[in-house]
A protein has these predicted regions:
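Thiamine diphosphate
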Residues: 1-191, 203
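Glycine/aspartate-rich loop-and-adjacent alpha/beta segment that forms the canonical ThDP
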Residues: 193-212
Length: 212
């Protein structure tokens, strides 16, 4: 008889494990964002952060700076780069640190990312995942505390998910990365630090179907 190992992981650990497994599974998966590589490629800082919420810890050391890239503080710029790289055949993850910054990227998200599939008659895939933090409650100030997913669910061409526990977080991030349409994943700040009360997290890779 075979058994499946399950562990009680934090939400952030579950997301991080999903990223490592998706990077191993598909060489076209890349990541870009602010501080995701630990500090602009400085050797003594690599992996020190793994992003503000430690979701990307260990990726640059394992997969290198060609696939894990720190970006300037220019959200519209790196979201545009992610849109272009997805249209060109890569499978990017764009880490938008706080959802309050997403308005800066409105043109790229609403006029390019959401519409590209339709503008080309379904012939162009756009496998792009935006991950962002959402929610108040940690004293993060006005521009870091919004909950905006109710806006984005009304735009055709976008899929939006908001995981509620580590099990769903791991499976939904995997599903988002493998999806051929753009997905925005809203990770609540109050969930990312604690062990969830939901199902324990299997060690192997798995998907939680989006929309179910």
């Amino acid at each position: 008889m075979t058994t499946t190992e399950v562990r009680a992981l934090t939400y952030a650990q579950a997301v991080n494990e999903s990223f490592h497994q998706e990077f191993e599974r598909d060489p076209n998966v890349i990541l870009m964002g602010e501080d995701v590589a630990g500090g602009a490629g400085r050797d003594d800082f690599e992996d020190a952060w793994g992003g503000v919420f430690k979701l990307t810890r260990g990726l640059i050391g394992k997969f290198g700076p060609e696939r894990v890239r720190d970006t300037p503080i220019s959200e519209n710029g790196f979201i545009g780069a992610a849109v272009g790289s997805a249209a060109a055949g890569l499978r990017p993850i764009a880490d938008l640190m706080f959802v309050g910054f997403i308005g800066v990227c409105g043109d790229q998200i609403f006029n390019n990312m959401a519409k590209m599939h339709y503008m080309f008659g379904g012939k162009v895939k756009l496998p792009l995942t935006i991950i962002t933090s959402t929610g108040a409650g940690v004293g993060s100030a006005a521009q870091h505390s919004e909950t905006l997913y109710s806006i984005f669910v009304h735009f055709p061409g976008l899929k939006c998910v908001a995981p509620s526990n580590p099990y769903n977080a791991k499976g939904l991030h995997a599903a988002a990365i493998r999806d051929d349409d753009p997905v925005i994943v809203f990770n609540h700040k109050l969930l990312m630090g604690g062990v969830g009360t939901g199902p324990h997290v299997p060690q192997e890779s798995y998907e939680v179907e989006i929309g179910k």
